[in-house]
């Protein structure tokens, strides 16, 4: 299965009548492996900050997490594995695997729990595949 198929079929899938606003699979260096049409472009320093937070959980909490210059308040995730952010009525979930970052961005009416489920389910699958 191609990386684009993972995004299209597993991240942008319908959940209780709703979809993520955008999603992507990135390398740890920020290289885009696959993305949805509306996925925002990360800046290199944003990826650096996200990767540092996986290595040093809590690093982003004081300043917030920036994605394409949009600021997200960092909320509880799983140290070293999942970062979650909130911005207005939407948010973001980032799951780190051995080689990739699985990213989902949502807006209402999709819920944080639905976004977490979609992103983390694919991320957990990739971890089991050694990716």
Curated annotation (Swiss-Prot):
Disulfide bonds join 13-115. It comes from the Eukaryota. InterPro entries: PFN, PFN_euk, PFN_sf, Profilin_CS. It is found in: Cytoplasm, Cytoskeleton. Phosphorylated by MAP kinases. The keyword Nucleotide-binding does not apply. Keywords: Actin-binding, Allergen, Cytoplasm, Cytoskeleton, Disulfide bond, Phosphoprotein. GO terms for cellular component: cell cortex; cytoskeleton. A motif (Involved in PIP2 interaction) lies at residues 81-97. Transmembrane segments: none annotated. One of its GO terms (molecular function) is actin monomer binding. The modification Phosphothreonine is found at residue 111. The variability of the residues taking part of IgE-binding epitopes might be responsible of the difference in cross-reactivity among olive pollen cultivars, and between distantly related pollen species, leading to a variable range of allergy reactions among atopic patients. Occurs in many kinds of cells as a complex with monomeric actin in a 1:1 ratio. PANTHER family: PROFILIN (PTHR11604:SF31). Binds to actin and affects the structure of the cytoskeleton. At high concentrations, profilin prevents the polymerization of actin, whereas it enhances it at low concentrations. Belongs to the profilin family. This is Profilin-5. It comes from Phleum pratense (Common timothy).
């Amino acid at each position: 299965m191609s990386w684009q198929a993972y995004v299209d079929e597993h991240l942008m899938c319908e959940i209780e009548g709703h979809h993520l606003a955008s999603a992507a699979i990135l390398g740890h260096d920020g290289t885009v492996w696959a993305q949805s049409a509306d996925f925002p472009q990360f800046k290199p320093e944003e990826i650096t900050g996200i990767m540092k937070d996986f290595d040093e959980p809590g690093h982003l909490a004081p300043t917030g997490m920036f994605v394409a210059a949009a600021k997200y308040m960092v909320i509880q995730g799983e140290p070293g594995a999942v970062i979650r952010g909130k911005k207005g009525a939407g948010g973001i979930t980032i799951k780190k695997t051995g080689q990739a970052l699985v990213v989902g961005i949502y807006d209402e009416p999709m819920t944080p729990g639905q976004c977490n489920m979609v992103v983390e389910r694919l991320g957990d699958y990739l971890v089991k595949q050694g990716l």
